[in-house]
Amino acid sequence: MAITGLTAGGSAEYEVRLDGTRRWPTGGDRPPSLIRTLPPAGPLELAFGSCRVTRPHRPPYTLSVDEHELGTGVDALYALAVRMQAQPADEWPHMLLLLGDQVYADEVSPETAAFIRARRDVSDPPGLEVAGFEEYARLYREAWSQPTLRWLLSTLPTAMIFDDHDVHDDWNTSQAWRARMRRQPWWSDRIAGALETYWIYQHLGNLSAAELESDALLRRVRSAADGGPVLREFALAADCDGGGGRWSFSRDLGRTRLVVLDGREGGSSRRAGARCSTTTSGAGWSSRRAVTSTIS
């Protein structure tokens, strides 16, 4: 849904209704969800981070690994949301940028592990790793459905790009790695499910209203009686050597341009043969001031 005609530097509360019934917000003592527009001048504040393993927000998972073998420490994305709820809106970041490993397909939570066990025999590969579209969709729902995180994502404009664990540890680090994985009988369902759900849960939110309007794949999915086969065909082609899929994107934020590059899947870089580029992602979250630059 594209909303136009908003005033720069403004904010507006909103709610979501389906068939006349309010679906969001769901209640509780959280602040209202807001649509905020960028200020006409001044610096931009961007919160960013990566490498978030989804776990329940309770001990022992919130303990450090030194305190308990199941501990993963404080969920910094959750902490950001809690901090924002205690602040006035003018102290919030203007945007959230997630730089990879938004989900871990190869290191699932106890809840997702139970979901997988109920669906298939985990003694067969890939075991308790995510196997396809349905399990990926479950993974994304779990990652972002906790009420405090839902509020954060409903209020803070967010952009994101994958790294390796969104698909598989060390994804696309070399042509030899790709050849080895393609020999696994479960891999085609895994990579198809990974890119299908990435397109739905991450990529579409990176596009502007104009880009969404002109996106040929989105039109095909919307017009199909069942968009699943259309999306799977695209995902498998995107992963093929030379098939390509454009995942890099940019956003113009006033006088600042944010450019986010795909360092994992860019198909054009494999047309000559070996996959040679890798990326590293740092764990943790921080907030910094974006440098204001003039876009010519």
Feature-to-residue mapping (PLM):
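Metal-dependent phosphoester/phosphodiester hydrolase catalytic core
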Residues: 1-296
